[in-house]
């Protein structure tokens, strides 16, 4: 009798637990799927480009649980014998929420990670510089946008072996699927055209003009009616009909370094959340009339974004702050942040990523399953050097401290040197500029060029450099202090500083 009662309770628990991850009424699921309340079984995963890690966060208390270390920082990753991953960047997950696919751009790899054990179960190497990967709605295939070439690599959803390639315009940026499972939408990072592909036979059935070439991210509404994509080079976000003839519906001026977009359904309606890296904000738009309804300050260089299984929160990776921010979608304000690795890029929220512990009982038949301490944290490592970075701002000379600085800078520790990443805004479009070190805070004195760059049509740029820069700009170890500045022109012919360092 006792055994029968135990089995009955276990069966009920198993059935309810299975129902939780059968689907969700949030992206990338269908509107008809049930919402999944936030629980300790859920995970937020962020892909970190410079530490080559995946950080794992518990969304209930916004606590970093640890990292999955896929590779090493400099200088180890420069070795000819290096076998780890490089430039960990893109991310997707399977329909059963038991596998995440993590793309490493520099090593041309897709890493398939078991969410229960945090262990890599397979690595598939594809073509040059893949950017993002996602599973089809039935989980039978994984489509990888190979941005350094002109095709989508289609992998078997079970063996992860490449089964075919779909030729698309040069530089595919990302693929997302219609929640009804019919179409794959592929935007481009090098060609001003998005294509629509039938999942069943891999045929292009629609073409949508992009306002500019650089699309990094794309999202579909749960009702399969709209597709939103960002344009990082021009600071725009575009919307087209998710069904034939795939007509363009709207072009929005969202702001410099428009990064990622995702869709949220909650008690107030359905909304698109767009991360604006150059403004350090998330902008919120209604999907029915495209009205902007909120602007949410987030922190430095918001990038990846994904909703919780019930739409009550969205999570945002802060690329130049090495944090994940949690946003309450009913209040549209940041309610918590947690530390992650260096330069988080793509981010996903996976409901029920960790199965309930064996024998766990769904107390009072609620949706909050019991997850014992330490369950689902195997193989995770502490941040270590992945958590070491410094940040500063650049602003026009004479700007007051209370004025918003247009440029954020992050210095990610890599041994004795750092990777510098500057999210530059507030400059003239399409002009050459120089990031330099000056002997004077005003940007005068002796100048040492660091990196030249060209601004995009939105007057913005992402600028990178490597060196012992933190030690120099802080005057550490008795090193004569220098100051980061931006000047118009080139190393050989430049004007006076237009932005100078501000702590």
Q: Residues of each region from the PLM?
A:
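Generic low-polarity alpha-helical segments
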Residues: 1, 15, 28, 484-485
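Gram-negative bacterial Sec-dependent N-terminal signal peptides
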Residues: 2-20
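Low-complexity, intrinsically disordered regions enriched in charged/polar residues
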Residues: 5-9, 243, 421
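Short glycine/proline-enriched turn or capping motifs at secondary-structure junctions
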Residues: 6, 337-346, 491-496
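Predominantly soluble domains enriched in secretory-pathway, periplasmic, or organellar proteins
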Residues: 14, 19-404, 415, 428, ...
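N-terminal leader/targeting pre-sequences
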Residues: 364-503
